[in-house]
Amino acid sequence: FLELKENFDSLQDYSKSKDKYSFIATRRNALDKIGGLEEYFLPKEFPYSIPQEFDNLPRLLGRAKVNIKTSKGDMQAIVDGFNAPLTAGAFIDLSSKNFYKDLPINRAEEFFVLQTGDPIGEEIGYINPDTNMERHVPLEIRIPSEDKTFYNETFEDLGFYTETPTLPFATLGTLGWSHSNTAIDDGSSQFFFFLY
């Protein structure tokens, strides 16, 4: 806790002096420490049920660390299955199958987002070898004030116009699962990370 307090004090100083690089490095360090503390408070059992209609999908009922290797350097991601068990499960499943190995970045918006996971060829997602069909992962939304996770519904559908998700897209490097503009249940393999 003392180290975190020092980090927060340093963040204030770097913010005042507009030292962007020191601020980002210190913020990463603080977030790592917070993540370490969070591990002490994780439930021993998975805290809620997943609808049976998704029993055929892989799931992560906890957290995992994944190394992401790119031509520009390596990163480590913490994948949160407590708040998005099906999305996290699909990502871990595909990672363990080396699905993402050597796939290019297929979307890059400067200072905003990078996206990958589009397989080489005509397919736009992961084809399940058992069914020869594209595997789809539903949109998962978890809101701190709610006891359950919502599947295939948007904030607007649910009437939560001003709510913030448990996993907000507010930190450099945050990962997200890609869905098309036309359906909320068609995420398959593509993911993105924010650059701001």
Named regions from a protein language model:
Residues 1-196:
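Cross-family detector of peptidyl-prolyl cis-trans isomerase
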